[in-house]
């Protein structure tokens, strides 16, 4: 099961609240081939699409992701934690 930690949800909400996003725009978890940036995943701003899954925090949608990628990341945890490179989101697959 894909899990988003409380720490990650708090940081996603902080990021979302700090942006002036247009109505209907959200933070999206993207993985290859959609994600072409550094690393194995990224968080981008995008509109909600049919079949998306929403992650809520304090009754606010803080993250969306394609329903079909949940099988690819079904045993993973999205977290926000301190790493040797500083505080960042991590996607740990088990």
Where on the chain are the PLM-derived regions?
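Long, hydrophobic N-terminal alpha-helical segment
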Residues: 1-19
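Detector for the mature cores of small, proteolytically processed
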Residues: 39-94
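Short, low-complexity, intrinsically disordered N-terminal segments
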Residues: 14-27, 56-57
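Short, structured protein-protein interaction patches enriched in aromatics and acidic/basic residues
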Residues: 22-48
């Amino acid at each position: 099961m894909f899990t988003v930690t409380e720490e990650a949800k708090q940081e996603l909400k902080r990021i979302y609240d700090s942006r002036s996003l247009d109505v209907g725009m959200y933070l999206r978890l993207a993985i290859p081939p959609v994600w072409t940036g550094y690393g194995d995943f990224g968080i981008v701003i995008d509109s909600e699409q049919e079949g998306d899954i929403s992650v809520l925090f304090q009754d606010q949608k803080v993250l969306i992701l394609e329903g079909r990628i949940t099988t690819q990341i079904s045993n993973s945890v999205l977290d926000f934690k301190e790493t040797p490179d500083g505080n960042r989101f991590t996607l740990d697959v088990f």
